[in-house]
Amino acid sequence: MKAGLTRRQVLDRTEKRAFVEFLADVFGSTSMVVVTQNKGLTVADVTELRRRIRAAGATYKVAKNRLASRALDGTQFDGIAPLLKGPTALAWSEDPASVAKVIVEFAKTNDKLVVLGGALGSQALGVDGIKALAELPSLDELRAKLVGMINTPATRIAGVVQAPAGQLARVFGAYAKAGEAEAA
């Protein structure tokens, strides 16, 4: 073990191999990866960032660059390997917009988190690409809009179909009242 490091800070070969396999599985099953530089973030900052990312259904992991590069080899995200320099962390999610939104919003309020880039599928994205992705609505927002658009015509048709029946009922009601008034 290296001098000055605790057992927890040094990974043995089997742990490294398991971590590379874990990341390779993640990169094989996710649609979006964002690479950030987290130099100078406090524990409280990282905890808050992880909480926000978890709430968005994403994951944030600090990884050794060499191990992350090995995990990237042969995956659709291997184009982001050059971004892995310095103290970096990876965030990933199935919903591309959600992870990008959380990272970009957090970076606006905390200048110690720097977005380096990322990838959406096999397409490598720069900082501007990640920021543009953050402007898009999330999958849940898109689903809600789609359901609303699908329901709107049905609601209008139901309103049109019900309107004549209501009008007829009012006309019959008026005739009935008029007939009662004449009979009295």
UniProtKB/Swiss-Prot annotation:
GO CC terms in record: ribonucleoprotein complex; ribosome
GO biological process, one term: translation
Keyword rRNA-binding: yes
Record-linked CDD domains: Ribosomal_L10
GO MF entries: large ribosomal subunit rRNA binding
One Pfam family from the record: Ribosomal_L10
Keywords: Ribonucleoprotein, Ribosomal protein, RNA-binding, rRNA-binding
Alphabetized InterPro entries for the sequence: Ribosomal_uL10 (IPR001790), Ribosomal_uL10-like_sf (IPR043141), Ribosomal_uL10_bac (IPR022973), Ribosomal_uL10_bac_type (IPR047865)
Cross-referenced PANTHER family: 39S RIBOSOMAL PROTEIN L10, MITOCHONDRIAL (PTHR11560)
Job description of the protein: Forms part of the ribosomal stalk, playing a central role in the interaction of the ribosome with GTP-bound translation factors.
The protein's assembly and partners: Part of the ribosomal stalk of the 50S ribosomal subunit. The N-terminus interacts with L11 and the large rRNA to form the base of the stalk. The C-terminus forms an elongated spine to which L12 dimers bind in a sequential fashion forming a multimeric L10(L12)X complex.
UniProt family annotation: Belongs to the universal ribosomal protein uL10 family.
Protein name (Swiss-Prot/TrEMBL): Large ribosomal subunit protein uL10
